[in-house]
Design a protein with these regions (language model features):
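Short amphipathic alpha-helix that is part of the acyltransferase structural core
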Residues: 2-43, 60, 168-177
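A short, internal acetyl-CoA/4′-phosphopantetheine-binding micro-motif in the GNAT/acyltransferase core
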Residues: 84-91, 120
Length: 177
């Protein structure tokens, strides 16, 4: 907490959550980079973030991006929460949960009935209604269609061999809406 001249602590400003803009990509990448280095999140090229900017929500305090998350629609009834991250000084404040719930509301507004994630943070997602799943969450017909996608996240969802190094240790989780 900041200390005003009186010596009394003041509350930090509550981050505002909004849709991302192209100008936010540098801030998103700066937030994600240390997590990608530790292999908590998948590293992505800048162009990938620009292509997906419309999928992102960001949390901002005083012009600084302190949180982000994306919702990627995979099929008529299924979307994935991706790249959910908060700044170290925001951990434990509930910001990650706020961003997640905004993404879930986006999914509902789109008519999606299930939200999926690949994560190491199972307790966090369990607190938000996600449950661990085994096997495929789609029919064989949808699986065959998804195989045609060029998106690396879809390949991870399908558990394809070529992306195994990205997903080792991750838990597949699903939330019905």
């Amino acid at each position: 907490m900041a200390q005003p001249p009186s010596g009394q602590p003041t509350a930090s400003p509550t981050p505002a959550i909004r849709r991302a803009r192209t100008a936010d990509i540098r801030g998103i990448r700066a937030l994600v980079a240390p997590l990608a280095k530790r292999r908590v999140l998948v590293s992505k090229e800048a162009v990938t973030y620009y292509e997906a900017v419309h999928e992102f929500r960001v949390a901002e305090v005083d012009g600084r991006i302190v949180g982000c998350g994306a919702l990627h629609v995979m099929w008529e009834d299924l979307a994935e929460v991706r790249t959910l991250a908060v700044a170290p000084d925001q951990l434990g404040t509930g910001l990650g949960g706020r961003i997640l719930e905004e993404l879930v509301e986006d999914a509902r507004a789109l008519g999606v009935s299930r939200v999926f994630c690949l994560t190491f943070e199972t307790r966090f997602f369990e607190r938000h209604g996600f449950v661990a799943i085994e096997g495929q969450a789609v029919t064989p017909e949808v699986y065959a269609e998804l195989l045609r996608s060029y998106d690396e996240g879809v390949a991870e969802f399908l558990d394809l061999e070529r992306v195994k190094p990205n997903t080792l240790g991750n838990t597949r989780m699903l939330r019905a809406l």
